[in-house]
Structure formats: structure tokens, C-alpha cells
């Protein structure tokens, strides 16, 4: 049938951890612990969506971070430095990820509605398997249980922005065509992942990394501040090529209906 058969969802900032704070805070701590180098939360957010080793590598290439590194060590960050930061990052992330495992508002109801329509729920993450093995059961205790998940270090081909984690979901879920899949993510590399896999893509402008606020902060934010942050996030997601941008996963059902209408007219991603 020419309709959406599966959605492939990111984790932090998409289904759990409103604002995607678990990884950003840990990057700051890992740089400090490994080399006593300070980075800001805003800097930590810039490469979000990549695998975590690649994320650290990208942070080291940010001009401001590279300048700090050069001032301290007289050289740019090396692969050995990245390994050391990653070694500090992993135990911190494994220990703390369960504290950020609660589903974002609207996720459980949206998943139930999608499943009622016969849509399968795939997922993938920039987290490595050691972190996902803690996060997945913790999220399940809160009621979020996707049909499949893939970690960034599971596949020899690699992670985002390549298509491989998304395509592994297609295989595992037995989906007949990538055009019948929707990739949902709050960061640009995840949108690129979906596009590279030949899927429809939906960006989330409020619940995730680009908006960058806690749930409590979002609830008390002025309409003006929300609008500015939303526009900033949406522009980045559209620039990455997202077919649609909505606030959070709670808005996905309407998008699915719109995509189904386009598929019925013969359109493809």
C-alpha cells in the first residue's frame, strides 16, 4: 500500500531528554576532565547528531575551541586527544544517561496513534551501544519501547550523516520501500541521514538540540523568546533539507497524513 509504513526516530531531543541536555553537559565535563579545557554548552551543541567520537573531533575544529586548544598546548587537537576525551566521555555518559530517559511530552500518545495505523517504530542514535544499553531499558520503564534501535557504532559503514542506521531499521522492520519511511530528528546530521536514505524527513524545532531549552525553561518562556528560538531551529533544519519542521513529536500524526496524501498522488521524497 502506498503510504507510510515506518517512522525512524532519533533519541535525545526527539523522543527523550527535552532539549538534548544529556550529551551536551557530558561533553563539557569530558573536555574539562581530560584536558582542563573549557567549552560552552552552545559549542557542545554545534555538531549534535554525529557519533560521539566524531562529535568531539568536530568540536576540536570549531575556531574558538581550536584557539583555546592552541593557546594551551601549542597545537591543534590530535586523534589521541580525541580518544582521551572520548574515554572520559563514555563512563560519564553511561552513568548519567538514565537521568535523561523520560519520554518528551506527547511521545507515548503519538507512538500509540502511529501503531494504531499500522506504522512501525524504528530508532537510531548518535549514542554508542554501551550508552544505548542503559538508555533503552530506562526509557522502556517510562513506557517508550520502539520496535528496533541502532547505535552509532553498530555498523561498520558508520553513522550519521550517512544513511546506514536508518537503512538498518528498514531491513530489521521489513519495510518494502524507503519512500514509505519518515526519519524524524532534532539535528541537521539526522536530517541528512534520512535524506541520504531516500526517506521523508521531519525536523523538530522545539523539543531538541537547536532550541536548546529545558522543559521547565520552555514552559516559562515568553511567546517572543519561543518564536525567536523556534525560527532559529527551524531555519537550520530546513537548511539541512527537512521536508517538514514541527515543534515536537506530538505534531507528527498530521505530517504523516500529509505525506500519505502526497504518496497517493505519486510523489516521492
From Swiss-Prot:
Active site residues according to the UniProt entry? 10, 52
Q: Name one GO cellular component term.
A: cytosol
Name of the protein in question? Phosphonoacetaldehyde hydrolase
Subunit structure, briefly?
A: Homodimer.
**Entry cofactors:** Mg(2+)
Catalytic activity from the UniProt record: phosphonoacetaldehyde + H2O = acetaldehyde + phosphate + H(+)
Q: Which family does it belong to?
A: Belongs to the HAD-like hydrolase superfamily. PhnX family.
Q: How many and how are cofactors bound here?
A: Binds 1 Mg(2+) ion per subunit.
Q: What is its EC number?
A: 3.11.1.1
Gene field:
phnX
The record's PANTHER family line, in alphabetical order, gives: PHOSPHOGLYCOLATE PHOSPHATASE (PTHR43434), PHOSPHONOACETALDEHYDE HYDROLASE (PTHR43434:SF19)
Q: Which GO terms describe its biological process?
A: DNA repair; organic phosphonate catabolic process
Q: Which amino acid positions bind Mg(2+), per UniProt?
A: 10, 12, 186
A single Gene Ontology molecular function, please? phosphoglycolate phosphatase activity
What does the protein in this record do? Involved in phosphonate degradation.
Pfam families per UniProt: Hydrolase
Q: What species is given as this protein's source?
A: Salmonella dublin (strain CT_02021853)
Give the keywords, sorted. Answer: Hydrolase, Magnesium, Metal-binding, Schiff base
Magnesium: present as a keyword of the record?
yes
Q: For this UniProt entry, which residues form the secretion signal?
A: none
Enzyme class, spelled out: hydrolase
Amino acid at each position: 500500500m502506498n503510504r507510510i509504513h515506518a517512522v525512524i526516530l532519533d533519541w535525545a531531543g526527539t523522543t527523550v531528554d527535552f532539549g538534548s541536555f544529556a550529551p551536551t553537559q557530558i561533553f563539557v565535563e569530558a573536555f574539562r576532565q581530560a584536558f582542563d579545557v573549557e567549552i560552552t554548552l552552545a559549542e557542545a551543541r554545534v555538531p549534535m547528531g554525529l557519533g560521539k567520537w566524531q562529535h568531539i573531533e568536530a568540536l576540536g575544529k570549531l575556531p574558538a575551541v581550536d584557539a583555546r586548544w592552541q593557546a594551551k598546548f601549542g597545537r591543534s587537537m590530535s586523534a589521541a586527544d580525541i580518544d582521551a576525551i572520548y574515554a572520559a566521555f563514555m563512563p560519564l555518559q553511561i552513568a548519567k544517561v538514565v537521568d535523561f530517559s523520560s519520554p518528551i511530552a506527547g511521545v507515548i500518545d503519538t507512538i500509540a496513534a502511529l501503531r494504531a495505523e499500522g506504522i512501525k517504530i524504528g530508532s537510531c542514535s548518535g549514542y554508542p551501544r554501551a550508552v544505548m544499553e542503559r538508555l533503552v531499558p530506562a526509557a522502556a520503564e517510562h513506557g517508550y519501547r520502539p520496535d528496533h534501535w541502532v547505535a552509532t557504532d553498530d555498523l561498520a559503514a558508520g553513522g550519521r550523516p550517512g544513511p546506514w542506521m536508518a537503512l538498518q531499521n528498514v531491513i530489521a522492520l521489513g519495510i518494502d520501500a524507503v519512500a514509505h519511511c519518515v526519519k524524524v530528528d532534532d539535528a541537521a546530521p539526522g536530517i541528512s541521514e534520512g535524506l541520504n536514505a531516500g526517506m521523508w524527513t521531519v525536523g523538530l524545532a522545539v523539543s531538541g538540540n537547536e532550541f536548546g531549552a529545558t522543559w521547565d525553561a520552555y514552559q516559562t518562556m515568553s511567546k517572543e523568546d519561543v518564536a525567536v528560538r523556534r525560527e532559529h531551529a527551524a531555519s537550520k533544519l530546513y537548511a539541512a533539507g527537512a521536508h517538514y519542521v514541527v515543534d515536537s513529536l506530538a505534531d507528527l500524526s498530521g505530517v504523516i497524513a500529509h505525506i500519505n496524501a502526497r504518496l497517493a498522488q505519486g510523489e516521492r521524497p
